[in-house]
Regions:
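Asp-based, Mg2+/Mn2+-dependent phosphohydrolase catalytic module
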Residues: 53-61, 73-196
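Metal-dependent phosphoesterase signature
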Residues: 5-51, 62
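Structural motif
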Residues: 69-71
């Protein structure tokens, strides 16, 4: 919210509506409203993305541990974790910014917390898979192999909107997101989790 309010277009609209620049108090108030609304609907958005359950099953069959990082708070995860488990997804560990002094992505600390909890001795044994530029940056800052996932990503937009595009437009959008991930430093970019 703070970042958005610093965007010139949004700040200009704010000033037109309220007659003054936004303040830190405004940021806190907006975040409180956002969090309240999000908490009221969060349980509807805990379904694993396509191919995740199949990939997790294969990784576990190979003895690979799964740690997760999130931008959600612990309170939000208290809603998401049980719903995701009901749907069949349960990582071995997960960490939110609450676990690392409220310093989330793109900082690497949640990855390091996962490594410690899972007894992983080297960043060379870690693959970070994510669907945002912040995920990619988090992985790169941690020094781990980092994979960007295009379809279903926040960078791509809503699935329904994507599905409505022509094949040509889909390919353009895929390439745009692929380039964003590569520019952020992704070691690999895959179309969907099934390619992992």
């Amino acid at each position: 919210i703070r970042t958005m309010l610093h965007m010139p277009r949004i700040q200009k609209l704010w000033e037109e509506k309220y007659g003054q620049a936004s303040t830190e108090e405004d940021v806190e108030k907006l975040y409180g409203l956002f969090e309240e609304k999000l908490m009221s609907i969060l349980d509807r958005f805990a379904q694993p993305k396509p191919y995740v359950l199949e990939v997790v099953k294969e990784l576990r069959a190979r003895g690979i541990k799964i740690g997760s990082t999130t931008g959600y708070t612990d309170d939000m995860m208290a809603v998401v974790v049980p719903k995701a488990k009901e749907a069949g997804y349960e990582p071995d560990t997960w960490f939110s910014p609450d676990s690392v002094g409220h310093v989330g992505r793109p900082y690497p600390y949640m990855i390091f917390q996962n490594m410690e909890a899972l007894h992983v001795s080297s960043v060379e044994h870690v693959v970070k898979v994510g669907d945002t530029v912040s995920d990619i940056l988090e992985g790169k800052h941690a020094g781990v192999f980092t994979v960007g996932v295009v379809e279903g990503s926040s960078e791509m937009g809503l699935t329904e909107e994507y599905d409505a595009l022509t094949q040509e437009k889909k390919e353009e959008k895929i390439e745009e997101v692929r380039q964003r991930f590569q520019k952020a430093g992704a070691d690999a970019v895959i179309l969907h989790m099934g390619e992992l």
